[in-house]
């Protein structure tokens, strides 16, 4: 008993209780009891236990390192009671990702902050956590979300945090059947008017936009098969941009062809008449220096007082006259033809070239291309004018001869 106490006192080296300098003992220095300080946490009975005799001490919480930081504390120069032992900080675990000491645990970016009532209840429900994660992903604009939503129409009515993709919905079968029936009945003109669209919208309980979109797709997918079953060409009953471009180019080409063909029509009557088999008709139509007015005035009458489509009439007339008719019939027809409206071209032709320039016939704009459905009621009028002109030229030829 005395040996143990002396050993402890030798190891401590000072009767003070606030420090225990290492006086050569290999055991951890613990403060010894002091008779005048009842706050000491160790008693002589504990220090005299058999464990001390064997040179071992039980593990006890260490004293604060601040009390051992100075030499005075190590030497036990003060007899003040030791401060209460501070709470030992928990060992900081190493971060598996960074390999360094991690700080105090913070909530993860995907984890909802806990409320005071949920402190002991564990994490938030899984559904709310997933919704929050999807909302953050949608707000950050990740590439995967953009790639997935390329072929999906933007739904502005739904909230951004829902994260649910709007599935493609099909129209009701009753509504589709009504639209199909209307399409089959009007398959040759499958373009409903605004009133018909409104009526179909009421019958099918769909919006007008849905009806319009359905007809746009049906004309491209359903209508061609319907028309082929009837033996019709789908391109003739549908309007497309490609067909419109083709029709525009064909119309431009036709107009250019007509304009290029106009000079040939203007020159053919003179050459064909001179080349006719009857020499009596070819002689008066040949140009002569004695009567230049009649030769120069004739193109103005034919080209500027009639339509372009009738320019080939003198050519056919000259051929028919050159085959078998004689000039007596032409003279009789010319005498019986007494319309005053046709005397105006005759007067202009009898006068010289100076009067033709003053009358303004040469300044008239060229005629427009003829319509394919144009009425050819003026054909007989042109025939009569040509007969009268031929008779007059025959008389002039006889007088000059």
UniProtKB/Swiss-Prot annotation:
Keyword set includes DNA-binding: yes
DNA-binding annotation, residue ranges on this chain: 164-226
GO biological processes: amacrine cell differentiation; cellular response to growth factor stimulus; determination of left/right symmetry; dorsal/ventral pattern formation; fibroblast proliferation; negative regulation of cell population proliferation; negative regulation of gene expression; negative regulation of retinoic acid receptor signaling pathway
InterPro entries the UniProt entry points to: HD (IPR001356), Homeodomain-like_sf (IPR009057), KN_HD (IPR008422), TALE_homeobox (IPR050224)
Stretches the record annotates as Disordered: 1-34, 78-127, 139-170, 274-293
An annotated Gene Ontology molecular function: sequence-specific double-stranded DNA binding
Gene Ontology CC: chromatin; nucleoplasm
CDD domains in alphabetical order: homeodomain
Cell compartment(s), UniProt: Nucleus
Function: Binds to a retinoid X receptor (RXR) responsive element from the cellular retinol-binding protein II promoter (CRBPII-RXRE). Inhibits the 9-cis-retinoic acid-dependent RXR alpha transcription activation of the retinoic acid responsive element. Active transcriptional corepressor of SMAD2. Links the nodal signaling pathway to the bifurcation of the forebrain and the establishment of ventral midline structures. May participate in the transmission of nuclear signals during development and in the adult, as illustrated by the down-modulation of the RXR alpha activities.
Family membership noted in the UniProt record: Belongs to the TALE/TGIF homeobox family.
Disease: Holoprosencephaly 4: A structural anomaly of the brain, in which the developing forebrain fails to correctly separate into right and left hemispheres. Holoprosencephaly is genetically heterogeneous and associated with several distinct facies and phenotypic variability.
Protein's recorded name: Homeobox protein TGIF1
Organism: Homo sapiens (Human)
High-level lineage: Eukaryota, Metazoa, Chordata, Craniata, Vertebrata
Name of the coding gene: TGIF1
């Amino acid at each position: 008993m005395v040996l143990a106490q002396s050993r402890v006192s030798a190891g401590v080296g000072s009767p003070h209780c606030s420090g225990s300098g290492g006086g050569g003992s290999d055991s951890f220095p613990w403060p010894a009891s002091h008779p005048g300080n009842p706050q000491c946490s160790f008693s002589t009975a504990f220090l005299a236990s058999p464990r001390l005799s064997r040179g071992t001490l039980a593990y006890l919480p260490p004293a604060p390192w601040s009390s051992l930081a100075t030499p005075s504390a190590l030497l036990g120069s003060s007899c003040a009671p030791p401060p209460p032992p501070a709470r030992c900080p928990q060992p900081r675990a190493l971060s598996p990702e960074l390999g360094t000491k991690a700080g105090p645990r913070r909530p993860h970016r995907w984890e909802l902050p806990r409320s005071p009532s949920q402190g002991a209840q564990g994490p938030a429900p899984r559904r709310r956590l997933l919704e929050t994660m999807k909302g953050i992903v949608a707000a950050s604009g990740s590439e995967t979300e953009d790639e997935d939503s390329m072929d999906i129409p933007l739904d502005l009515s739904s909230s951004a945090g829902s994260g649910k993709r709007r599935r493609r919905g099909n129209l009701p079968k009753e509504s589709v059947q009504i639209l199909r029936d209307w399409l089959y009945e009007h398959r040759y003109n499958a373009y409903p008017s605004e009133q018909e669209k409104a009526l179909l919208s009421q019958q099918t309980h769909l919006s007008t936009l849905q009806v319009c979109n359905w007809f746009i797709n049906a004309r491209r997918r359903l209508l061609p098969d319907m028309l082929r079953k009837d033996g019709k060409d789908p391109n003739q009953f549908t309007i497309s941009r490609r067909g419109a471009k083709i029709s525009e180019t064909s119309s431009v080409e036709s107009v250019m062809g007509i304009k290029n063909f106009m000079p040939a029509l203007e020159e053919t009557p003179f050459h064909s008449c001179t080349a006719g088999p009857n020499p009596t008709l070819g002689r008066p139509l040949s140009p002569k220096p004695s009567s230049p007015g009649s030769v120069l005035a004739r193109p103005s009458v034919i080209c500027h007082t009639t339509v372009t489509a009738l320019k080939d009439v003198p050519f056919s007339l000259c051929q028919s006259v050159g085959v078998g008719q004689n000039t007596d019939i032409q003279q009789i027809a010319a005498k019986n033809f007494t319309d005053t409206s046709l005397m105006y071209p005759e007067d202009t032709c009898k006068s010289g070239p100076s009067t033709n320039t003053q009358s303004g016939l040469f300044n008239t704009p060229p005629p427009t291309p003829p319509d394919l459905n144009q009425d050819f009621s003026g054909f007989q009028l042109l025939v009569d004018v040509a007969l009268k002109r031929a008779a007059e030229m025959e008389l002039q030829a006889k007088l000059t001869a």
